[in-house]
Amino acid sequence: MFPFIAGIINQLHTRFALIPKLLALGLLVSLSACSLLITGYNQAPSLLIFSWVNPHLDLNSEQDKQLRADLQVLHQWHRQQQLPIYADVFQKVAVLAPKEMTGPQICSIFDELKDTLVPLSQQMSPVIARLALKLTPAQLQRLEQQYDKDNKDYRKEWKLDASADKQLQVEVDKGIENAERWYDRLDKKQKALVKQLAKDSQYDQQKSWGERIRRQQDTVSTLERIAKSQQGLAWSQQEVTALLNRSLLNSPDETYRAYVDMRKDINCEAAAQLHTTTTAAQREFMVKTLKAYEADIRALVK
């Protein structure tokens, strides 16, 4: 269950490999509280290296210096080229929020955000390629080990080894948390609806888990191939571009692609259905929250 725009953004940008984590550089705006948004975004390159890249790769000083320089360039591009798109989306949803909304309307927002991934991945490709050319066997081994650790945490968070009822409850809890971020407190009937929508969502943990593992293995093998071949930046960038496409846009697993398309439609309809139950006060809360995000994002562009 992905309630409204928070879930749409999270579904787009919560990914499982090195590449998507790097792409999360400019997407802190979708995850931070308004009061922390500006500080978090302005420090995004350093925060990304500190919180994810170094724990997974343990960069040496030369790699760290190059990546920081590359991320600063990417960060500036993202600030000028993509933040205005996010601000426009928040503005658009703020206009829609007081009214009833349909599944197709919400899916159009999803598609608008998804479209930002193509130019973002194009800008990210040379950054990742330069880093990949410098990676050592020990760093790639460390990446695999950290993925194993991440996966244990993921299985624990989503209770993949527990009963179906406990897995469902995790989805419900996360759905309510996301919804209340935008609508404030839900009442009992709305929480019950979130639970029913989660039951009806056809979410398949095993499909998501399988794709997670595929992306991780694909990332490691691609980075290893680049590091070993040393065929230059142009070739390496092509390899990274193909990896980004497989990771973010078009999984090579046809069954998974069909599943994602189905889930998108279901989630959009679910979000519209939940929105229908909201009160005028809840919609006003959403409008105020959206406008606050929009204002902070536009301030970041200046």
Kindly label every feature range from the protein language model.
Residues A129-D253:
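Extended amphipathic alpha-helical interaction segments
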Residues V53, Q66-L67, S121-L135, L143, ...:
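Short, structured motif recognition centered on aromatic/hydrophobic residues
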